[in-house]
Amino acid sequence: DLILAEDTRTSSVLLRHYDIDNELRSHHKFNEHQTAQSVIKRLQSGETVALISDAGTPGISDPGFLLVRECVRNGIEVQTLPGATAFVPALVSSGLPCDKFCFEGFLPQKKGRQTRLQTLQDESRTIIFYESPHRLLKTLQQFSEVFGEKRQVSVCREISKIHEESVRGTLAEVVEHFTQTEPRGEIVIVLAGTDNGEKPVKEKNVSKNKYKKDNIE
């Protein structure tokens, strides 16, 4: 009955491709507190509501948690479809241990950022972050200061897209790479934990996706 989208302009392209013309409304981080209760009322009246993201999976560094929590509190069934999540392929292709890991998502932009990093200094599991391209270099430089420039890291961008690319090496090497090469696209940083921080994955390398992915115009 209702489709909630992070950005209706983006989602409408996909929906039009499949001739889906159900009611479409925006549901994002700036309005989810206001819209959650009205959505709950529609669900309680017997309607069916779908929540989709621009990319990735709702709730994973995307809107969705608040609405799901309200559904659970109100005894409303939530069905989740397996979807794309950037950090999983980034982790698998990093060459770093993926049997144990922690997902940190986006770091605070200002307040609490340094404190958050300091709490992770002794983390032995592989650590995964999301970052925007214009903050990537500064973030990697901060990582070098906090974790040491010899710590192994893999930076993946544009996962599942035509220009998919992974840059692997020590923090010092990857900082040097992105000092010379402007980062673009959506970024996933996979950082080695303390147990394997000094063990090289490989010499610094850049791998690119050989296969073009399906595009919907």
Q: Which functions belong to the PLM regions below?
A:
Residues 21-29, 78-79, 99-105, 150-156:
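Short hydrophobic/aromatic-enriched beta-strand-loop microsegments
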Residues 47-48, 126, 130-217:
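A contiguous loop/helix-start segment that scaffolds small-molecule binding in enzyme catalytic cores
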Residues 1-79:
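Class I S-adenosyl-L-methionine
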Residues 9-11, 56-57, 86, 135, ...:
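Alpha-helix capping/helix-boundary segments
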Residues 8-9, 26-33, 84, 104-109, ...:
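Short, acidic/turn-prone active-site loops that include or flank metal/cofactor-
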Residues 1-23, 87-88, 92-102, 111, ...:
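RNA substrate-binding interface of SAM-dependent RNA methyltransferases
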